[in-house]
């Protein structure tokens, strides 16, 4: 499932991120890539252990915590500490699949990457090229979103970032280990949850239809979740 989530960050929050990142040290982005992906990758990142990355990463995690769409769609068990990248003119990332398992630095644990996320920090008018191109079961999708918006997609997807021909594209990116590893089951649960929300707009929570749908949703989640 590929999902666009608008307004994860407000315009004021995006400006704060941009100001902090302007002052950050940027290094070669290949340091976080696997051996094969590193050969396809040409971009910049701020170091994962930098004060800016830690502060802004915590900010992103708080924004995710208050976003019901992200939590319904990703059903996150663990979220990898958000990273920040930058593509200047001429930079790109050729087609690749994200590493299946990633160690969390300093945490003594690893996560399975089920859901990939890109949170855009520059608007589409600030650069040419730079589309996130995702190949999924419904074909090839080209994504270029407003600043503050985010896209979710299965980490199993082959994806790339087109070469930048003007300007600079900034973003935060991270992975989630979902309580439900199978993308089809996650999509069904998300659609089920959306249907419950719409039903509750028309019927009281005590209505048998609402109670029945809610009960079935939670029983399916109980059946499929891995903790």
Swiss-Prot record:
Signal sequence bounds: none
Record-linked Pfam families: 2OG-FeII_Oxy_3 (PF13640), PKHD_C (PF18331)
Domain Fe2OG dioxygenase: 78-178
Domain of life: Bacteria
An annotated GO BP: DNA damage response
Alphabetized GO MF terms: 2-oxoglutarate-dependent dioxygenase activity; iron ion binding; L-ascorbic acid binding
Binding residues for 2-oxoglutarate: 169
Residues annotated for Fe cation binding in this entry: 96, 98, 159
Enzyme Commission number: 1.14.11.-
Cofactors, names only: Fe(2+); L-ascorbate
Record-linked Gene3D superfamilies: q2cbj1_9rhob like domain, Rabenosyn, Rab binding domain
Cofactor note: Binds 1 Fe(2+) ion per subunit.
Keyword tags: Dioxygenase, Iron, Metal-binding, Oxidoreductase, Vitamin C
Name this polypeptide is given: PKHD-type hydroxylase GOX0559
Organism phylogeny: Bacteria, Pseudomonadati, Pseudomonadota, Alphaproteobacteria, Acetobacterales
């Amino acid at each position: 499932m590929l999902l666009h989530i608008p307004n994860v960050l407000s315009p004021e929050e995006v400006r704060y991120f941009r100001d902090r990142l302007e002052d950050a040290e940027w290094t070669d982005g290949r340091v976080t890539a696997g051996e094969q992906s590193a050969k396809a990758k040409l971009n910049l990142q701020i170091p994962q252990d930098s004060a800016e990355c830690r502060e802004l990463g915590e900010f992103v995690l708080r924004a995710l915590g208050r976003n019901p769409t992200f939590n319904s769609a990703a059903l996150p068990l663990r979220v990898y500490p958000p990273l920040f990248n930058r593509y200047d003119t001429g930079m790109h990332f050729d087609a690749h699949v994200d590493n299946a398992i990633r160690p969390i630095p300093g945490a003594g644990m690893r996560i399975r990457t089920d859901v990939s996320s890109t949170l855009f920090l520059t608007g589409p008018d600030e650069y040419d090229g730079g589309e996130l191109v995702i190949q999924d079961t419904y074909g090839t999708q080209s994504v270029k979103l407003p600043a503050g918006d985010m896209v979710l997609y299965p980490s199993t997807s082959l994806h790339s970032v087109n070469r930048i021909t003007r300007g600079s594209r900034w973003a935060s990116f991270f992975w989630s280990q979902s309580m439900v590893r199978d993308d089809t089951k996650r999509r069904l649960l998300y659609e089920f949850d959306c249907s419950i929300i719409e039903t509750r707009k028309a019927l009281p929570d005590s209505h048998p239809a609402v109670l029945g749908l809610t009960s079935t949703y939670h029983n399916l989640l109980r059946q499929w979740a891995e903790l």
